[in-house]
Amino acid sequence: MELNFWIGLLIGLVAAGITYGTGILFATIGEIFAERAGVLNVGLEGMMLMGAVTAYLVAYNTGSAWIGLLAAIGVGGLMALLHAFMTVTLRADQVVSGLALALLGSGLSAVIGAPLVEVRTAPRLPEFPIPVLSNIP
């Protein structure tokens, strides 16, 4: 009986890790490509937070999750452009610039997102079931 509990707990932890770790996995893959190009981007977390708040805000106000996604891509691109400007043009250290962007994104997303906490829901993207993977419990 006790073994079944631990197996169930392990399965639940792995399932939760896969579910909640997908966004971090995407950021990790992006950072791997950036590292291969010789860029150390420590500010990915701030960029992701700003993109998430922007996507939610735009999707809620426009009623379209696709426009929210495009806005998040634009904000992420602007923050990446700011990182490139600081490191290439101003010759700032990549770690310092990345940490500044991480702190900026974290703080600014908290300030912008505070009024959105009371908002119930925003439009969602449609589901795209993958034939083999969608049948896995």
What is the predicted role of each segment?
Residues 32-51, 88-101:
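Short, non-helical or kinked segments that cap or interrupt transmembrane helices
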Residues 35, 63, 91, 113-117:
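Short helix-capping/hinge motifs at transmembrane helix termini and TM-loop junctions
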Residues 106-137:
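Transmembrane helix-bundle core of multi-pass membrane transporters
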Residues 21, 25, 29, 50, ...:
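Generic alpha-helical transmembrane segments of integral inner-membrane proteins
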Residues 63-108:
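Alpha-helical transmembrane segments within multi-pass membrane transporters and channels
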Residues 28-33, 53-58, 81-85:
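Alpha-helical transmembrane segments of multipass membrane proteins
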Residues 1-27, 40, 54, 62-68:
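Membrane-interfacial amphipathic/re-entrant helices at transmembrane-helix boundaries
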